[in-house]
């Protein structure tokens, strides 16, 4: 074979071939068309190699897209005070998702209990989340002034990229019952 190197005909990567016919293709993941592929989307690239006598041979490369994880930013923690008269019993935040695979950049709307069971959460498709402390939970109600607990929940972008939200819970002084 005639040793050669260069870019594929579609420009999605580069190739090289040595005189023994061993060839290598390297995909350019930074190419916008390659980076934008959704999971399972196809592309192809090709290049022509030549034998020692000049006979051409077309080599075609099949490229299959994979899921790129979303980049999640925003409020990933919150704080609530147990049973305080002026203290919040909810924490709120907002997240954003940037995902080249899913242009909606949305979240999977969900609601449920926190991982430790001290409260409940909800998130909408726009990434707005709310955590509500359950002041009737025995572990929460038993907190002394300044005692800490934590709860957490996991939310997911449209493509399934997880993001952990952590909630700090602080005990307050409950008035005596007479």
What are these regions (language model features)?
Residues 1-11, 71-117, 177:
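Extracellular ectodomain surface segments
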Residues 7-64, 85-86, 95, 114-171:
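Acidic, turn/loop-rich segments in luminal/extracellular domains of secretory-pathway
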Residues 67-72, 127, 173-177:
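Proline-centered linker/hinge motifs at extracellular inter-domain junctions
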């Amino acid at each position: 074979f005639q040793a050669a190197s260069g870019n594929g005909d579609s420009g999605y990567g580069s190739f090289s071939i040595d005189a023994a016919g061993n060839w290598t293709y390297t995909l350019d993941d930074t190419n916008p068309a390659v980076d934008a592929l959704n999971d399972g989307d196809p592309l192809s690239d090709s290049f022509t190699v030549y034998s020692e006598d000049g006979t051409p041979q077309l080599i075609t490369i099949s490229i299959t897209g994979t899921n790129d994880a979303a980049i999640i930013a925003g409020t990933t923690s919150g704080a609530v005070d147990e049973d305080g008269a002026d203290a919040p019993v909810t924490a709120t935040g907002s997240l954003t998702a940037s995902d080249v695979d899913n242009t909606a950049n949305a979240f999977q709307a969900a609601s449920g209990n926190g991982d430790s069971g001290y409260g409940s959460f909800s998130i909408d498709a726009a990434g707005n989340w709310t955590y509500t402390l359950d002041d009737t939970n025995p572990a929460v109600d038993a907190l002394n002034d300044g005692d800490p607990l934590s709860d957490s929940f996991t939310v997911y972008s449209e493509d399934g990229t997880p993001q952990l939200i952590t909630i700090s819970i602080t005990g307050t002084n409950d008035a005596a019952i007479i």
